[in-house]
A protein has these predicted regions:
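Short alpha-helical elements
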Residues: 1-187
Length: 187
């Protein structure tokens, strides 16, 4: 894991300014991850069935603007990386509702986030024995396309499609620079 004391600190004033203006609304946030191939190898690269790679984990607000972006080795499951992604969160207040796909359906994750005041909403996996939701909160899941659109915007940056950097902090810097350019378009 890359230390959050690096480039993430530069995004804090931008995020807080946009929040004060009402552009960012963190009450309802969406989480997902995407894969970037790492052709050159390097640190924090995980082997998967698709080859060497990096996982880009993002939390976006209800308008599709990034609130947290982090990079991790691709061989880790997304549930184990959610708490680490809050180290890169650029606002003081955490979201009330965090909406994810079926990969985030975990009782342990639900309990951990509930202790921090965050309600995790994810559809149940087909193998789940005990149902914990009745479906009312899943109406928020329909807007999860916002995080997919964010990744589409992010992958327009050719530099981020394939990781050529050896050091993980350099690649994280490019990812966060792309997110800052998205946020600066809101001014």
């Amino acid at each position: 894991m890359v230390s959050p004391r690096g480039p993430a600190r530069g995004a804090d004033p931008v995020g807080n300014t946009l929040r004060d203006e009402g552009t960012i609304d963190e009450r309802e946030s969406f989480i997902d991850a995407t894969f970037a191939a790492a052709k050159g190898g390097g640190e924090a690269v995980g082997l998967t069935k698709r080859g060497k790679g990096v996982k880009i984990l993002a939390i976006v607000d209800r308008h599709g603007l990034p609130l947290s972006v982090s990079t991790h080795a691709a061989n880790h499951h997304e549930v184990t990386l959610v708490q680490l992604s809050f180290d890169f969160y650029m606002l003081e207040a955490k979201p009330e509702h965090l909406i994810g796909d079926r990969a985030y359906d975990s009782d342990g994750l639900d309990d951990d986030l509930k202790q921090n005041g965050v309600n995790m909403i994810a559809p149940h996996r087909s193998t789940r024995k005990l149902k914990t939701q009745d479906g009312r909160h899943l109406r928020r899941y329909e807007r999860r396309w916002l995080v997919e659109r964010f990744f589409a915007w992010l992958q327009w940056k050719r530099r981020l499609l394939i990781r050529w950097e050896y050091y993980a902090t350099n690649f994280l810097g490019f990812v966060q620079l792309a997110c800052i350019t998205m946020l600066l378009k809101q001014f």
